[in-house]
Amino acid sequence: VAVTEAVVAKAQGNFATLNDIATDVKNKFQDKTVGLIMPILSRNRFSLLLKGIARGVKKLVIQLSLPSDEVGNHLITQEQLLDSGINPYDILTEEQFYKLFGTPKHEFTGVNYVELYKSYGGENCEIIFSNNPCSILKYTKNVINADIHTRDLTKKMLLKAGAEKVVSLSDILNESVNNSGFNPEYGLLGSNVSTDEQVKLFPKDTMQFAKDLQKEFKSRKGKTIECMIYGDGAFKDPVGKIWELADPVVSPGYTDGLTGLPNEIKLKYVADNTIGNLQGEDAQNAMIEIIKQKNKDLKNQNVSLGTTPRRLTDLLGSLSDLTSGSGDKGTPFILIKNYFKNYAD
């Protein structure tokens, strides 16, 4: 059973206001000029965080990456970047960007994110463009790195390059401010718009929730069911080129039985190379026997070619997210059956 993170977070009352965000940022930077680098281009995921951060600083310098953000939301196309002849690791000002690329809008939302983020960044906001995280240090030594999956490496790069203070989104609201919600592990990462002045944070205490839910199923139904919380799936849209995973992880909490990777043989490979001379029931029985006798670790073995094992929680969470959608299906949890069965069962 996979439960969507939103249900858990809402049940926990894990919310924070923009003023809570501003207070935490102000406490960390003391009204200094702050650089905000590598944010994703998303009204749902980042616009309100930007507003809150802007309220807590004296001046904000926002550094955007080209041609897209970390998860594939494009400011411009790859072709436009190539044709421009610029080095994306150099610094491009807002004026230079508009001169080269006009006023591009997001392919799906129709939003001009440069204009939107400039308006949300407050009166004293500047926007630059560079794929080099350390470019921001020419403007300020105090930085919020807003990237998600590369945040630890980015922070290390900035500190080695001379930054005085670097704070990731996971460091903001990792403790309660003014009795706000918080997430000790992920801070603002995984948050969503709730209202115009409030965000819903990623749920906390998630491992315990999964274990408690499993106990409840056992108590009420007498069955041991693996349980997990899921947010964004880890799949990438082949048309829009957007990677769905804007959360810090696919599954922040799960029971012990969901730890690890699949260990499978490739039926097509075995059918062609091992039992190709057999037909009908003989072929079926031979395949079943091969599956039953497979090694516990098939790494680097030909029979596992093309199976590319991924974490079970990433696979199941992606399956759940694709099933539940992101709109009005009304599916707070997903029931998955027979996932751990194979051809031999």
List where the protein language model places each region.
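Conserved mixed alpha/beta catalytic, RNA-binding, or beta-rich assembly cores of soluble enzyme
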Residues: 1, 6-345
